[in-house]
C-alpha cells in the first residue's frame, strides 16, 4: 500500500505540473488515479483499469470502475485544449522534430483516429496529437480534419521548432503539400505510382516510370507533381531489393540526398508498433477489443494511454541504461529484445519486491530522464 501511495503521489505531482494550469485539482486527481490504473493493468479496458486501480489501493472494484467511467465522460477534460501542454512535455528540449501522421481504424465502433506521433530513437513513435471521429463524418471532410490537426500542432509548438511530416500514400495529395508549405513544415510523403511527375527539364512521366534500372533510386530535384504542377523540393522513386512495392516520395528539401530522403521516410514505420502497443490485445493494451461508443471518450482514453506509455517507456529506458535488461532475457544477445515500453511494464510490476539498492538506482535514473523536460523539473526538485 505504501508503494502504491508513493506511485500515486508521483503521478499526481507530475500531472499537476503538466496540466495544473488548465485543469481543476480534482480533475487532475481523477486523471492521476486513471493513469495509475492503466500503468498497473497495462490495459485500456475500463473495467480492467478500474479493477487494477481498486486492487492497488485496496478499494472496492465497483467504485473504481465507475470512477474511471465517469472520467472518460467528463466534458471538463477537453483533450484538444490540453494538447499544447502535452506536446510541450512530449518534445522536451527537442526542436528538430520528425512527426509521423497516419489514420488508424476501430471498425467495431465505426470510428477512425488521426494520429500525429513524434518519431523517437527507441522505435516507438510518441503520440503528440490525435483526433477521433465516426467514419460517416469523414466523407468530404477528411482533408479538413487533417489540416485542422496539423494547424493545431503548429500552434502548440515553439516558434523555433523545425518539423518534418512523414506520411504514406494515403496522404499523397498535392493540396496537402501546399498546405504544409504554408505551415512551414517540411515533409516526406509517399504518393501513388500512377501520378504524373514532371522533371526540371520539362519531361513528364508517371512516377512508376521514373524508377531507375533494376529498381535503383532516382532523384528529381525541383520536380512538379500531378496535372496541377505542384512544385516540391524533390521526388525520389525507388524499388530496392526487399521492397514489396516501389516508393515514390515527395520531399520538401531539394538539397537532401537521395539516401537521406529514403531513410527519413523509412522511419514512418515507427508509428505502426505504437498502434500495436495501443490496440493489440495480446501484445499491447487491447484498445481494438474495447467498445467505445463516443469519439470524445476514445480521445480521453488515448490521453491516459499516452501518459502511461511515456512514463513506462522512460522507466524502461532507465532500467536499460543501468543494464537491468540483461536480467529480463534468457539469451546473451547484445541487441534489445524487449521494447522500452515492455521493459517499463516489467520493472513497474517488480517495484514492490525490488531490492532497495536496485530500486534507488532505478528511480534516480528515471528522475534524471524526466528532468530533461523543463515542464516537470519543478516537481522533481522539490525536497
Where are these regions (language model features)?
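Short glycine-rich loop/turn motifs
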Residues: 111-116
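Single, function-defining residue in the core of a domain
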Residues: 1-43, 83-84, 94-97, 108, ...
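Short, charged amphipathic recognition helices of the HTH superfamily
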Residues: 41-51
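Active-site- or DNA-interface-adjacent structural scaffold in DNA-acting proteins
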Residues: 39, 53-108, 167-168, 181
